[in-house]
A protein has these predicted regions:
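A glycine/proline-hinged amphipathic helix-loop "lid/cap" segment
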Residues: 1-87
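Short beta-strand/loop motif that positions the catalytic acidic residue
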Residues: 263-265
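Short amphipathic alpha-helix adjacent to the substrate-entry channel of hydrolases
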Residues: 114-134
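Proline/glycine-enriched tight loop/beta-turn segments at coil->beta junctions
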Residues: 81-83, 90-99, 256-258
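Hydrolase active-site cap/lid region
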Residues: 189-241
């Protein structure tokens, strides 16, 4: 499979994707804002210290919260205990609301409902759907498959109980960014009951052993680094055997029968190639998949839509796809 990744990436100019653009000036401005935050050294601090620093920076850079129709925090029951969720209801829409279930990014190590509050507010308003944000368990305290179990259990809970809280949840959309994109598509793979209408994957992690060109091209100096990716994998996986489990590396799964997908990638992102190759694997498996690369931007750009306007455009694109 690794060889096929290299081959597919070599021919990406034929995929109909946007050709190379200079780094967006708005990204450069964001980098200058990020410079005021101490950069955690993964070799010298604990995962918990890394999480605290990364979450704090994410929240402070998210900007003023978007007005929303309503917010409700709940703790639901999963197979291994309580799972915290937050329900965002869109402005000017009466219940019952159709549903997007959202899984935040953060390398399976950091991130939370709070770090992605801005994204979920905007997605709810633009899509006209309720967004249910899931606070799944994080590594290394809870290694694979804990996050997967929480992600799936939360989706099942919403489908089974949504009507009681004003949600039209017979069919749901799953969405997520980075590690959350991994969880969204894995939930789709697991959902034999076919309750998933569509999947939205922002720069998803799809292969734990990926060695494609973009990892080396953009693995240093563009926000997400190769060293961080390796470290995240070490925190998340129990051992190397987990790396080839299709629930950790959905690139290795049977993708036939999955729901239509929107895959959004960022040009200056080490995860770019694996996201794009995953979209083509979906198509080769008979799944309708829309692939869009945003030029000139970095991993995580939707979280910084206050500074990088392409982030808002990507969320608006997702909202349009959800409403189709």
């Amino acid at each position: 499979l690794r060889a096929s990744i290299w081959i597919a990436a070599t021919f990406k100019s034929k995929m109909g994707l946007q050709q190379s653009m200079p780094l967006d000036p708005q990204v450069k401005k964001l980098f200058s804002l990020m410079a005021v935050f101490p950069q955690p050294d993964i070799g010298k601090i604990t995962p918990q210290q890394y999480r605290e620093a990364a979450d704090k920076a994410s929240i402070q850079l998210s900007g003023e919260p978007e007005a929303i129709g309503g917010i409700e925090d709940k703790t639901i029951q999963g197979r291994n205990g309580g799972i915290r969720i937050r329900i965002y209801r869109p402005l000017n829409q009466r219940p019952p609301h159709k549903v997007v279930i959202y899984y935040h990014g953060g390398g399976f190590v950091f991130g939370s409902i709070e770090t992605h509050d801005n994204v979920n507010r905007l997605l709810a308003n633009l899509s006209g759907r309720a967004v249910v944000s899931v606070n799944y368990r994080l590594a290394p305290e809870n290694k694979f498959p804990a996050a997967v179990e929480d992600a799936f259990d939360a989706a099942k809970w919403v489908v089974s109980n949504g009507e009681s809280i004003g949600l039209d949840s017979n069919k749901v959309v799953v969405a997520g960014d980075s590690a959350g994109g991994n969880l969204a598509t894995v939930v789709n793979i697991m959902a034999s009951e076919n309750f998933i209408e569509r999947q939205v994957l922002f720069y998803p992690s799809t292969h734990m052993l990926d060695n494609s060109p973009s990892i080396h091209e953009y693995g240093e100096g563009f926000f997400l680094t190769m060293d961080q990716m390796r470290w995240f994998g070490q925190q998340y996986l129990r051992d190397v055997r987990d790396a080839v489990n299709p629930y950790a590396s959905p690139m290795l799964a049977d993708l036939s029968g999955l729901s239509p997908a929107l895959v959004v990638t960022a040009e200056y992102d080490p995860l770019r190639d694996q996201g794009e190759i995953y979209a083509h694997r979906l198509r080769a498996s008979g799944v309708k998949a829309t692939l869009t690369r945003f030029g000139g931007v970095i991993h995580g750009f939707i979280s910084f839509y206050r500074y990088i306007y392409a982030g808002r455009d990507a969320i608006a694109m997702a909202a349009g796809f959800i409403k189709q």
